[in-house]
Amino acid sequence: MDVRCINWFESHGENRFLYLKSRCRNGETVFIRFPHYFYYVVTDEIYQSLSPPPFNARPLGKMRTIDIDETISYNLDIKDRKCSVADMWLIEEPKKRSIQNATMDEFLNISWFYISNGISPDGCYSLDEQYLTKINNGCYHCDDPRNCFAKKIPRFDIPRSYLFLDIECHFDKKFPSVFINPISHTSYCYIDLSGKRLLFTLINEEMLTEQEIQEAVDRGCLRIQSLMEMDYERELVLCSEIVLLRIAKQLLELTFDYVVTFNGHNFDLRYITNRLELLTGEKIIFRSPDKKEAVHLCIYERNQSSHKGVGGMANTTFHVNNNNGTIFFDLYSFIQKSEKLDSYKLDSISKNAFSCMGKVLNRGVREMTFIGDDTTDAKGKAAAFAKVLTTGNYVTVDEDIICKVIRKDIWENGFKVVLLCPTLPNDTYKLSFGKDDVDLAQMYKDYNLNIALDMARYCIHDACLCQYLWEYYGVETKTDAGASTYVLPQSMVFEYRASTVIKGPLLKLLLETKTILVRSETKQKFPYEGGKVFAPKQKMFSNNVLIFDYNSLYPNVCIFGNLSPETLVGVVVSTNRLEEEINNQLLLQKYPPPRYITVHCEPRLPNLISEIAIFDRSIEGTIPRLLRTFLAERARYKKMLKQATSSTEKAIYDSMQYTYKIVANSVYGLMGFRNSALYSYASAKSCTSIGRRMILYLESVLNGAELSNGMLRFANPLSNPFYMDDRDINPIVKTSLPIDYRFRFRSVYGDTDSVFTEIDSQDVDKSIEIAKELERLINNRVLFNNFKIEFEAVYKNLIMQSKKKYTTMKYSASSNSKSVPERINKGTSETRRDVSKFHKNMIKTYKTRLSEMLSEGRMNSNQVCIDILRSLETDLRSEFDSRSSPLELFMLSRMHHSNYKSADNPNMYLVTEYNKNNPETIELGERYYFAYICPANVPWTKKLVNIKTYETIIDRSFKLGSDQRIFYEVYFKRLTSEIVNLLDNKVLCISFFERMFGSKPTFYEA
């Protein structure tokens, strides 16, 4: 029997079992049940003394146990690490057992199961059926997984089944209540193992009149009275709410491979199951594959107060307890963890994922026709957009113009769409799927048949969006890749944090190397310095800036320095200069390079003046070996990705290489995380110290380098910054560039693993050509060992606000001057939620203007400053006098929470007062909108005091009174503060700011 593993899960009844859900080549689903064990590692001496004897035991052979406590010394008299060798046993017990002196107890039982039996969680196997006992059709028991799964076979493709769903609930206030508000719609996108896709929506007929129901039937809707009458081929079905809920129960109890929702764990599934129990007393019941255990669908919460989010809200995740092998997947939770977005609402996520440039085909009266294909945007973007358009009802044009779809024509790689839209002047516009321009509260207030049918379209679109996002993020291949890499079940891949997922690969490595790492002392945590961030040399750059990044800097630092808890010889600290001098002189004699590397770190305690960590590089340590495995596997999958021919293979290999990249980059963080199995304080701080020296070394050879006559003269000798080696240190290097090229280079900024180097040219093509040659020369001549850099991009018209804050037009390494550059806003107000739309629009306008001025190159920095400030004053005065912009542009949002230090915090007071006077109260954890409002007769206010008292909560019913105005000065001051930080002339900026606002601006720290 050939099977592919698709999920592993446990039953937690009286008899615990582990189950595998697998699929055969013919699409048949097979479940295999295994005994569940708890695992313990003990020495032979303890094993022999156990009474009663272990249930099962396997010999692990001779293993080396190393004490990895850090040795801190004030001199070079460092004691050797404690190390012992003994025969070890792996004990399997069906129930928890207290065994003294058991080791390796930090690893998960499921990881022990996979590794001890030689099973890959996502592997394909030809099963030896003599080790299988049939329980029922499609379910077998296996007591010997090692022999049953002994024959691994090449991966083969299998079909999967999915249920994507969304619901709409009636509400008259802010949130629906399960006790009083019925479900009005449930929409499903059902994909079976044959690949057949069914789209259907159930409409609650109890919210319609009998006349409307009859009209709906006349218009093609199916009306049913019971579950038995359901026809899944019909798109629209009318039924009572009880029938609607029973159909949901029937669907959710099926064994799909995936049931996918958006925030469904917290809302949709919970609402369905609670409403079902309330109206019928029935529950959604899952049964284990052997049919011996039944559990009710239940949502349980996991609160991690140690990982508090914004405003002190605990990180809460929601989980479905099922035992039938279906993976209940919440896209909302997944995207929150994997993407950094301004908002995690479904419309914001879809806007980010599905957009493309569309060409204007026709302009009519209040309507416009757009066409999109591979000629209007990058290949594939129009096709992805067109797929979503099949169920889409609204399209967002140019970021914020929401237009209703009138007609649409869709083909394989493109689309044509007619939108209800004001006439727009340009020939091309960005089209995206954002928020539908509907007010659900008002729709329920005016509810009738037409509205019910409209809502059905919105609901099925949201259900389909779950499918589109599922495919866009490649969740299925990421799940399989994670299971293989982390040695975890598919259902648990996204449940754990990095400190847990690393345990599987670490255990695998320790068993391969016959190593056990133990600690006898309590882990101590001290702060340490992070990566090197340079101060920007200036604000605005008319010349191009070349961006070079170290490839996997921290993983390669760990490999280069052999940084690992067991390779740490010790840490030498000094309390005075004399002690430090003596230690420095003797260190290199006792621990000579390259076998040893000595790393100067910042002292861990205030009474120390120096701290030096010493690592032995003769035998590769656990962390470097782990990282080398990850990086080698990533390189292997990247190579396979290039050679892959099918889209399935490409998706799998891309997910695998990405997963290895993520896990490799997480190792550095885990070295400094006290609860991690890889915790090593000295290794973590040595990693950042070596990383800082590497970025300083690269900056030192590039800053002041010159290219002329085909020769590149680096600014400094190419000397290894850690120890002398036999490399050629001559800074003059022959290039393959034309001999008439004459350029100078200047380092202008750097951050952790990247260097920004200005070239005195505005030619994009030449800049890219030179940067690629620089990349080759740096990797061949400047860098050493396993360090490599990569030319990432040319930044044109770079505007540096401060460290980690900049705006630029990016030309990637694979582009040219004719390519459309990407606008990058890193760490700036355009990416923040606590900034008004007015502010974002204005700052975007002024950055664009600055960028154009830099491109033209006609003005010096003083002229640019004068021109920008003069224009800004005109714009602000004009807005203040006309007061024409709508209130929506000035609204801000904030999350309501109670984690304030002061009991009378003004934010809390604002919400409390609002809740006293409004029936729709603001709940804890909810975002609310507010704006600064003052009396209309208040003149321009220079000195802003007590601005919190002008905050006013903006709800649906708020209207700006004739005796009120927007307190523009608050917004203007914040905007101007950001703009003056873009300009180079501080004197002019201070003068302008004092004249407008009566105070000096705050300049960002360089």
Swiss-Prot record:
Q: Does the record carry Transmembrane as a key word?
A: no
What keywords would UniProt list here? Answer: DNA recombination, DNA replication, DNA-binding, DNA-directed DNA polymerase, Early protein, Hydrolase, Multifunctional enzyme, Nucleotidyltransferase, Transferase, Viral DNA replication
* Induction description: Expressed in the early phase of the viral replicative cycle.
Q: Give the catalytic activity.
A: DNA(n) + a 2'-deoxyribonucleoside 5'-triphosphate = DNA(n+1) + diphosphate
Q: Which GO terms describe its biological process?
A: DNA recombination; DNA replication; viral DNA genome replication
Please list which residues make up the signal peptide: none
Please provide, alphabetically and separated by semicolons, the GO molecular function terms listed in this UniProt record: DNA binding; DNA-directed DNA polymerase activity; hydrolase activity; nucleotide binding
Top-level taxon: Viruses
Q: EC?
A: 2.7.7.7, 3.1.11.-
Cystines in this chain: none
Q: Which PROSITE patterns match?
A: DNA_POLYMERASE_B
Alphabetized InterPro entries for the sequence: DNA-dir_DNA_pol_B (IPR006172), DNA-dir_DNA_pol_B_CS (IPR017964), DNA-dir_DNA_pol_B_exonuc (IPR006133), DNA-dir_DNA_pol_B_multi_dom (IPR006134), DNA-dir_DNA_pol_B_vir_insert (IPR013617), DNA/RNA_pol_sf (IPR043502), DNA_pol_palm_dom_sf (IPR023211), DNA_pol_type-B (IPR050240)
Q: Does the keyword NADP apply?
A: no
Family, similarity comment: Belongs to the DNA polymerase type-B family.
Q: Subunit structure of this entry? A: Interacts with OPG148. Component of the Uracil-DNA glycosylase(UDG)-OPG148-polymerase complex; OPG148 and OPG116/UDG form a heterodimeric processivity factor that associates with OPG071 to form the processive polymerase holoenzyme.
Record's function text: Catalyzes DNA synthesis. Acquires processivity by associating with a heterodimeric processivity factor comprised of the viral OPG148 and OPG116 proteins, thereby forming the DNA polymerase holoenzyme. Displays 3'- to 5' exonuclease activity. Might participate in viral DNA recombination. Does not perform OPG116/D4synthesis across an abasic site.
Q: Which PANTHER family match?
A: DNA POLYMERASE CATALYTIC SUBUNIT (PTHR10322), DNA POLYMERASE DELTA CATALYTIC SUBUNIT (PTHR10322:SF23)
> What is the name of this protein?
DNA polymerase
Q: Which organism is it from?
A: Vaccinia virus (strain Copenhagen) (VACV)
> Which lineage ranks, top first, belong to the organism behind this chain?
Viruses, Varidnaviria, Bamfordvirae, Nucleocytoviricota, Pokkesviricetes
- Name the gene: OPG071
